[in-house]
């Protein structure tokens, strides 16, 4: 029988991250792999969703997003980023940020166009490039070393990646999997290259509220769209998932100039029609939460980060301290395993903890063969139980 699967679908595998969740369930391991909380979503946000269902907001919303939700997104963007967004012309609501990214790439990339991505990178971007017939160009994020205490890129390498075929660059800040928060200076350098080469910036900012202040180093989240010259050439992608601990709701959005949004809306319409109407209404409530909510979120995740950082370090891992998001990349070379996949299988089956093989974040598996990623968006009891199991490695 002929192969009935397309060449595109045959050129990538299922998500390694989500496979690790399935293996954690199969073997009864504690899941520190996939980035979803195991603690309850905020009660008031859940109540807003229930109220919306009871109010019979259960039919299709406008394809590109319910009016009230788009207005709420625009209002939050104004107070948080200082940007005036037209909710009727510059926003599209999608089924999660995952759909926002693929819809954007399908809308703006032509066959053979190049998209630059920093490596290591979130695994979805590879299939997104394949599905949109675009070519990925990779720029290395170097791990902290003698030249820099944080993950960093080489400006010369980045400049060399831009050429006449460059259509876009993907920037994830705070970054998954490294936890890097791009500085204003780094983003300005990227912005200048985008302007010089007439390229778009596709920014994945789903962790915009999950970063850890450091006065000495000036850690802050900077949105690319706020930089001079970038308002109309940036597609800002976001969602409810991480900020409001509702990863299963699948409600995201993209903000961009009207011509870009028109294209993204067209693709979105025929991909999914629209995001869940009652959950968009709950999003109206979430977007109106006061600054204290975000301060508490930040404090809680910083506390979890600080707890989990100490455990791998005392058991033989070399940890790279994240400045944002809720992941920790670690070096496993001290354990003597052949590669990350072999090590993660050992952790799941013999130790009872599931993490993500580092190779899933690189184009060549050998580049991440001595790395694994931990996730700490979990209950204290979960992290403490995982710590107890990890101490068996000593």
Question: Which residues are covered by each model-predicted region?
Answer:
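A short acidic, glycine-rich active-site loop
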Residues: 57-60
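Short beta-strand to alpha-helix junction loop
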Residues: 64-65
